[in-house]
Amino acid sequence: MTTLGMTMLVLLLLLPLATCLGDGERSPWDSLLRALRSDPQACEPTISGGEMICRDEVCASTGCNCGYNIAKAHCYCACP
């Protein structure tokens, strides 16, 4: 294995540890991982009383919020 390959392997192994360390603030990696976990199709819309309501269970399980895009008429997971 090349030196570059070994360096990449070590960095990948240390990445989870780096996200756990710190002063309790969210790291940029947390936001990235949350964005990757959020599925645009996860919060399916339901119609109640003629209004479109986005279900929030799946988004909330990943720490995100379910939103409704009026222009595109669909629900989506929004991660802070």
From Swiss-Prot:
Domain notes: The cysteine framework is XXII (C-C-C-C-C-C-C-C).
Propeptide: 21-36
GO molecular function terms noted in the UniProt entry: toxin activity
Post-translational note: Contains 4 disulfide bonds.
Signal sequence region: 1-20
GO cellular component terms listed in the entry, alphabetical order: extracellular region
Presence of keyword Disulfide bond: yes
This protein's name: Conotoxin Cl10.1
Cell compartments where the protein resides: Secreted
Tissue-specificity statement: Expressed by the venom duct.
Keyword annotations from UniProtKB, A to Z: Disulfide bond, Neurotoxin, Secreted, Signal, Toxin
Record keyword Disulfide bond present: yes
